UniProtKB/Swiss-Prot annotation:
This is UPF0711 protein C18orf21 homolog. Residues 131-190 are annotated as: Disordered. Residues 149-182 have a biased composition (Polar residues). It comes from the Eukaryota. Belongs to the UPF0711 family.
Length: 217
């Protein structure tokens, strides 16, 4: 590979002073190596360096989009059946490529360089779009805390009676009324238990009976 670049650089240096020697260097290297070792911007027939003075460049564009082709594309998008002639015409439109024509003025021969077809470009574009969608991170959906608590309560209460559902206060909310009621009940039960233990066996109060105390809990 380094020898190829060296010979090409030497040929470009000799093209002004000795064009025949430059062509001979390019021909000698191409004849002793593989077919794919041709030089860029060089005529493959006479090994003349193609510059603006000794070459002519033309561009043959792809087949244009006609109304008939547009109708066939619309039918194909709707998954309609196409005849053999219509399918062949549509395939010819998709496989059409732009052609770069370079004519060497020394040997009067034309070299064709084909571009990429429409089907290849469409596939490349679709693959790039899918790769971009896979690479983009998916942001999780944010839900409000009230809606989340509501969803949890509804899911937990399915198949249960309303009496079995337990409501827990959310964080940040206090229940002073419930706490005061629980404290008064505890004091009352403690006083009843103290009176029940301190009374003698002779004078028993029916209101301070042990069964009555347990039933009041």
């Amino acid at each position: 590979m380094r020898q190829k670049y060296y010979i090409e650089a030497a040929a470009r240096g000799l093209v002004g002073s000795c064009p025949g020697q430059a062509r001979y260097l390019l021909w000698a290297y191409s004849s002793t190596h593989e077919d794919n070792s041709t030089f860029q911007e060089t005529c493959p027939h006479c090994f003349q360096l193609l510059v603006l003075d000794n070459s002519r460049v033309r561009l043959k564009p792809k087949a244009k989009l006609t109304p008939k082709i547009q109708k066939l594309l619309n039918r194909e998008a709707r998954n309609d059946t196409l005849s053999f002639k219509e399918a062949k015409l549509l395939r010819k439109y998709k496989d059409s490529t732009s052609v770069l024509l370079i004519t060497c003025r020394t040997c009067n021969r034309t070299v064709r360089h084909h571009g990429k077809s429409r089907s290849f470009l469409w596939a490349l574009k679709s693959n790039a779009a899918t790769a971009a969608n896979k690479a983009s991170p998916k942001t999780p959906k944010r839900t409000a805390p009230g809606s989340a608590n509501l969803g949890q309560s509804t899911n937990g209460s399915k198949g249960k009676s309303p009496s079995l559902t337990i409501r827990t206060p959310t964080s940040g909310q206090s229940t002073p009324i419930c706490s005061s009621r629980n404290g008064s009940k505890r004091k009352k039960h403690f006083s009843q238990l103290k009176a029940l233990l301190s009374q003698s066996a002779s004078d028993k109060n029916p209101k301070l009976d042990f069964r009555h105390f347990l039933s009041s809990l």
